[in-house]
Design a protein with these regions (language model features):
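Short, intrinsically disordered, charge-biased short linear motifs at domain edges
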Residues: 1, 5-7, 38-42, 272-281
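Iron-sulfur cluster-binding cysteine motifs and their immediate structural context
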Residues: 2-4, 15-38, 48-66, 303-304
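Glycine-rich loop at the start of a catalytic domain that most often binds anionic cofactors/ligands
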Residues: 41, 47, 117-118
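Acidic/polar N-terminal loop/beta-strand segments that form early-domain functional surfaces
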Residues: 30, 42, 105-107
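Short cysteine clusters
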Residues: 10-16, 20, 44-50, 54, ...
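Iron-sulfur-associated redox domains of electron-transfer enzymes in respiratory
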Residues: 55, 61-368
Length: 368
């Protein structure tokens, strides 16, 4: 029976929950906002499957990539909307055009980060761009398995530990699965993210109401978030900032109507000035397992890994236009074929060049 006594030994991937046929494992949030599996001993048969699919207990060997590229999407608008080079999009589009399904992280209506799937080109946009919050996998491992069994191509994207969890959950190789992980700094607490959004809404409301007369306690302007980007490129890729778009609405009773004087507004902050990003980059509220990550150094089993190619200007200055350059690690023959089909603008590089200013490929994070 799976028992979590050391929280650094659970990455929250949901593999154990997903594999349990008796559904006696649930994910429950702790006081830091992270989900951990809890087993109902009264219904558990002690079959051991949950332990067999745990990527922390059953780690793969480290791997070096077959090929490494500096890459960028030829579509400037797609690259603008992406965190780095926009390489995820053509990979996903190719799968969908072949009748497949793409899984990735998106915002829900409350701006929580969840994993979901799409089989439309339009749906890919929701997965585009980094989300610096641990996403909830939910039932997506099982959904991916069903699509794979049907013979449909599946692209599953996520953090290295989520990809490792998926592969352990599947317990067999599928030729129609393309696993893509994003090189990860660590995943912040969803609870901290929710608190940040609550405090930001309150701050925006207070600033807006300053100096105004409140007619009624039931009639007030409330900021409604309409868009979030953790990596806005308004001032360039190397000076990415946090952007939050919002609009003010008047709420009276149960009715909500747009104020005629309201227009969408933007909060754009450099990372050092945004309290959430500052804490994230200082490693203050990452999941405990991130400080002891077992999925780095190519151990996730992904076919392709994607990251920012920081320092690309030192090697290929003519290729760097400060609009975003991706670091693409091709980890398998399947990944090589998939990447070649993207027709991306790319230069073959080396692992050492990519690693030079991207230590998260190998190094653990520590509290600053």
């Amino acid at each position: 029976m799976l028992q979590i006594t050391d929280k650094s030994q659970c990455c929250g991937c949901h593999a154990c929950v997903s594999v349990c046929a008796r559904q006696c494992i649930t994910m429950q949030e702790d006081n830091e906002g992270f989900l951990y599996p809890v087993v109902d001993a009264s219904t558990c048969m002690d079959c051991g499957l949950c332990e067999k699919v745990c990527p922390v207990i059953n780690q793969d060997a480290p791997r070096k990539p077959l090929k490494v590229y500096a890459a960028k999407n030829r579509n400037e608008e797609v690259r603008r909307q992406s965190s780095s080079g926009g390489i995820f999009t053509p990979l996903a589009e190719a799968v969908i055009r072949d009748g497949g399904v793409v899984f990735g992280a998106k915002f829900d209506k409350e701006w929580n980060v969840i994993h979901a799937w799409t089989d439309t080109i339009e749906g890919i946009a929701d997965f585009r761009g980094s989300k610096y919050v641990q996403s909830t996998i939910g039932n997506t491992y099982r959904e991916a398995r069903e699509f794979l069994k049907q013979g449909r191509k599946v692209l599953f994207s996520g953090t290295p530990c989520q990809i490792a969890g998926l592969r352990k959950f599947l317990r067999k190789e599928y030729g129609n699965l393309l696993a893509v992980d994003v090189v990860c700094h660590g995943v912040p607490s969803p609870l901290v993210w929710r608190k940040y959004l609550e405090e930001t809404r309150e701050k925006l409301r207070a600033e807006r109401d300053a100096g105004k007369n409140t007619v009624s306690s039931t009639l007030m302007e409330m900021p409604v978030i309409t868009g979030i980007s953790f990596r806005d490129k308004t001032h360039g890729w190397k000076k990415s900032g946090f952007r939050l778009r919002y609009a003010a609405f008047k709420a009276a009773g149960n009715s909500v109507s747009s104020s005629a004087n309201d227009s969408e507004r933007t909060l754009l902050q450099p990372f050092p000035e945004n309290v959430f990003m500052k804490g994230f980059l200082s490693n203050f509220y990452l999941r405990p397992s991130c400080y002891a990550c077992t999925a780095r150094t190519g151990k996730s089993g992904s076919d392709i890994s994607i990251a920012d190619f920081w320092g690309v200007q030192n090697y290929y200055p003519e290729f760097d236009d400060d609009k975003g350059i991706g670091l693409v690690l091709v980890n398998s023959e399947k990944g090589r074929k998939a990447y070649e089909q993207t027709n991306s603008d790319s230069i073959e590089s080396t692992y050492e060049q990519g690693l030079n200013q991207n230590p998260c490929l190998e190094a653990l994070v520590y509290l600053s």
